[in-house]
């Protein structure tokens, strides 16, 4: 048996090829799996459950079917932090706190999206702190749908422009933040996404940090079992 982790699919109506690849993954890669964890940024943007795009509603139906036989867990990312209980229930996903500790085949493991570890990106961390306030999210949800969509598009555009100007170091995790989380959670394994830099890192010769990759050019999935870990890519099918 094994547990699967994915993240950073950034699904959108503009890239339905990624949605198709994800559907194939759900159809073919879940044999003998104990659970599926989605570590955030399942969608490129999410402005509210009441504005879910048709492709997202179709995906929710697919996930709901999968969840009848396989538990699906979801941690919010920086792109889909407004995804709520309404859509999660429709998709059969169980929402988890942004930092969650689980026992994985005898190894205590902390899982998260990963944006909280990029502490050198001060501008983003200020925005992240603002969006963490329930009152801010509530005020946003009260805005007219067109206004919410416009704000989301603006944030997305600014983020893409800003990221092009930021250094590699600033956009990666900060080692001190990683070490602090290991100490705080008393774990020896960490699994996250966000940076789009899939790798398995050994920290201080004692802990393991695994980064799942994005799905822009190919899929990425981490399989964890009692025998160890396997981080692999999933090439998209070409027609």
Curated annotation (Swiss-Prot):
Binding-site residues for Mn(2+) 2, renumbered to this chain: 41, 78, 113, 194
Pathway(s) served: Glycolipid biosynthesis; lipid IV(A) biosynthesis; lipid IV(A) from (3R)-3-hydroxytetradecanoyl-[acyl-carrier-protein] and UDP-N-acetyl-alpha-D-glucosamine: step 4/6
List of residues binding substrate: 78-79, 121, 159, 163, 166, 194
Catalysed reactions listed for this entry: UDP-2-N,3-O-bis[(3R)-3-hydroxytetradecanoyl]-alpha-D-glucosamine + H2O = 2-N,3-O-bis[(3R)-3-hydroxytetradecanoyl]-alpha-D-glucosaminyl 1-phosphate + UMP + 2 H(+)
EC code: 3.6.1.54
Keyword Flavoprotein in annotation: no
GO biological process: lipid A biosynthetic process
Cellular compartment(s): Cell inner membrane
Keyword entries, A-Z: Cell inner membrane, Cell membrane, Hydrolase, Lipid A biosynthesis, Lipid biosynthesis, Lipid metabolism, Manganese, Membrane, Metal-binding
Gene Ontology CC, one term: extrinsic component of plasma membrane
Cofactor(s) demanded: Mn(2+)
UniProt KW Membrane keyword: yes
Short name of one Pfam family: Metallophos
Main subcellular location of this protein, as a coarse class: membrane
Membrane topology of this protein: Peripheral membrane protein
Cofactor note: Binds 2 Mn(2+) ions per subunit in a binuclear metal center.
GO MF, one annotated term: UDP-2,3-diacylglucosamine hydrolase activity
Family annotation (InterPro entries): Calcineurin-like_PHP_ApaH, LpxH-like, Metallo-depent_PP-like, UDP-diacylglucosamine_Hdrlase
Positions annotated to bind Mn(2+) 1: 8, 10, 41, 196
General function of this protein: Hydrolyzes the pyrophosphate bond of UDP-2,3-diacylglucosamine to yield 2,3-diacylglucosamine 1-phosphate (lipid X) and UMP by catalyzing the attack of water at the alpha-P atom. Involved in the biosynthesis of lipid A, a phosphorylated glycolipid that anchors the lipopolysaccharide to the outer membrane of the cell.
Family the UniProt entry places it in: Belongs to the LpxH family.
Name the record gives this protein: UDP-2,3-diacylglucosamine hydrolase
């Amino acid at each position: 048996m094994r547990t699967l982790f994915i993240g950073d699919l950034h699904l959108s109506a503009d890239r339905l090829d990624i949605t198709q690849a994800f559907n194939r993954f759900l159809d073919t890669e879940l044999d003998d799996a104990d659970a599926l964890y989605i570590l955030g940024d399942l969608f490129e943007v999410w402005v509210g459950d009441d504005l879910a795009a048709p492709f997202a509603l179709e995906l929710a139906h697919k996930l709901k079917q999968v969840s009848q036989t396989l538990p699906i867990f979801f941690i919010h990312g920086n792109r889909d932090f407004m995804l709520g209980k309404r859509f999660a229930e429709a998709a059969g996903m169980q929402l988890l706190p942004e930092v969650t500790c689980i026992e994985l085949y005898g190894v205590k493991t902390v899982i998260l999206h990963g944006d909280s570890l990029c502490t050198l990106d001060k501008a983003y961390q200020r925005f992240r702190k603002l969006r963490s306030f329930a009152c801010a999210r509530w005020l946003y949800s009260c805005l007219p749908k067109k206004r919410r969509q416009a704000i989301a598009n603006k944030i997305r555009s600014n983020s893409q422009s800003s990221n092009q100007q930021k250094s590699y170091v600033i956009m990666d995790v900060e080692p001190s933040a990683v070490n602090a989380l290991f100490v705080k959670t008393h774990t020896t394994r960490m699994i996250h996404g966000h940076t789009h830099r899939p790798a398995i890192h050994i920290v201080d010769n004692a802990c393991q940090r695994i980064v799942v990759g994005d799905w822009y050019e190919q899929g990425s999935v981490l399989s964890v079992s009692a025998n160890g870990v396997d981080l692999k890519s999933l090439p998209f099918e070409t027609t």
